[in-house]
Amino acid sequence: MARLPILLLLISLVYSTPSPQTSKKIGDDATLSCNRNNTNDYVVMSAWYKEPNSIILLAAKSDVLYFDNYTKDKISYDSPYDDLVTTITIKSLTARDAGTYVCAFFMTSPTNDTDKVDYEEYSTELIVNTDSESTIDIILSGSTHSPETSSEKPEDIDNLNCSSVFEIATPEPITDNVEDHTDTVTYTSDSINTVSASSGESTTDETPEPITDKEEDHTVTDTVSYTTVSTSSGIVTTKSTTDDADLYDTYNDNDTVPSTTVGCSTTSISNYKTKDFVEIFGITALIILSAVAIFCITYYIYNKRSRKYKTENKV
């Protein structure tokens, strides 16, 4: 007979009704509610807590008391007193809000004079989805170019006078507090495998010849830069003139330009503090008191001797 209660307990655990689940996303609001089965008794108090040991609120009549750093801004209690349903709303869900929430009813019979309180509780599981999906749209664009053929004969190509102009930008030297410079060099080549035909079409060889740098086609411009240095004694502006030829040489050489240093001096003025005056006053007062004490002692001794001398003369 002792095995029967154990068997019934195991059966109730196996076939118990699972807790309802609510699934929400991060940032959403979740509304949790539960109904009580005992509709005849009088509700004394209802409560909500989160497993394992976190009390959210206690509600009695029109008063709601929050615990464990929960506030009405985070969790609102939306149930009228002594209703069959108790409801809370969790706002702006985060990953920490996920878990099992339990509601409880504390009830008493209105016709019973005893202090017996019945208890019912129901649980619901809140799932907060933290997985986010993102879609990346990649658009690829391009064009194909098929080389055009020319009907020109090799001997005709050699007789043509062809020229091409190219514009190449050399790398910019790295400088501090100097305006950006771009050295533009124009090159002219008398021998290149590009032919201009009468029809406007062009034919390009697959392996063009290297382009040589010619010094006579360089275009040199002068650049004036201003460097402003702010110090505690004022603002110093330095004007410097730099031409692109010098910049080109600076880029190719490993020489560095020495920087200009602007120095300034700061004069510190010390003021006497209240503490210093107190110390001076204390020392002066001590000297005066010492002098007064010495005077009093001397006067006392002198007066005592005078009285003694007068007494001896009277006798």
From Swiss-Prot:
Q: How is it modified after translation?
A: Glycosylated; contains phosphate and sulfate-substituted glycans. O-glycosylation is required for hemagglutination and hemadsorption activities of infected cell membranes.
Q: What is this protein called?
A: Protein OPG185
- Would the keyword Transmembrane helix turn up in this protein's UniProt record? yes
Q: Where does this polypeptide localize?
A: Virion membrane; Host membrane
Q: Can you cite an annotated GO cellular component?
A: membrane
Locate the transmembrane regions by residue number.
Answer: 280-303
Please list the disulfide bridges: C34-C103
